[in-house]
């Protein structure tokens, strides 16, 4: 841009809070970011965005606001609405080719917006639960049976399966993968960012993915980074998906496994991918 400064759209969204006194995982809360100016006629795809373990152990209130406050997701939304993106929007974790490709794509097809729903995620990586893929299933029941019905009732959300996506980072990426595959009748897209999968889990997750595909076409994306401690396990999962002929996207981008990644490429990549695939379009 001429002045070298990024444009920030301060009015990009409004917040809607959802509180639950009880449910499959006990009390819960979620914050939804709803595109501002929705006039009631336009309906938006829904993305359930899940935070990492740091927010899980800080409690329900902090967890529900993890993507909003700790990961600065609102800034990512605002910048996607006001391209071109700059290197600083990715906290420096982007190469020239990908930055150019994303900006060219945004110039051709502007970001239209999602209802991003951010619930608290229980600690499914505790010493008791980390060896069990099923530890996330009660949380998945909450999302599908309690949270999504309220989102549809109280926001301008689309309700069809193909317009529902789930994604998350680290612990949240693990949860998104397990929950999305378990409820593939409700989700059309599953994304993960630096998912906290273990080295011995690729085969079991691939088996769940094959079963999930019986519900119809499913967009799956595995994103890791060059300094992600889970990169090796995610590469194994990518190989297991390839061997099982499970269609998916696999992306390795620059960045560490920390808040800077979440606030930079993590949020941007997540939002842009779901903005496209939940409308049945190519991601870039």
Residue map of PLM features:
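Gly/Ser-rich "nucleophile elbow"/oxyanion-hole loop immediately N-terminal to the catalytic nucleophile
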Residues: 37-42, 129-170
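Primarily recognizes the serine-hydrolase "nucleophile elbow" in alpha/beta-hydrolase
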Residues: 160-207, 211-214
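Short, proline-enriched alpha-helix->beta-strand connector loops that line the catalytic pocket
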Residues: 110-113, 214-220, 244
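Short, solvent-exposed loop/turn and secondary-structure capping segments
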Residues: 42-44, 57-65, 127-132, 179, ...
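C-terminal catalytic histidine-bearing segment of alpha/beta-hydrolase fold enzymes
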Residues: 219-223, 227-284
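Active-site machinery of serine-nucleophile hydrolases
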Residues: 50-145
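The conserved beta1-alpha1 loop
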Residues: 45, 50-52, 194
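A domain-start/cap signature at the N-terminus of enzymes
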Residues: 1-45, 54, 99, 114, ...
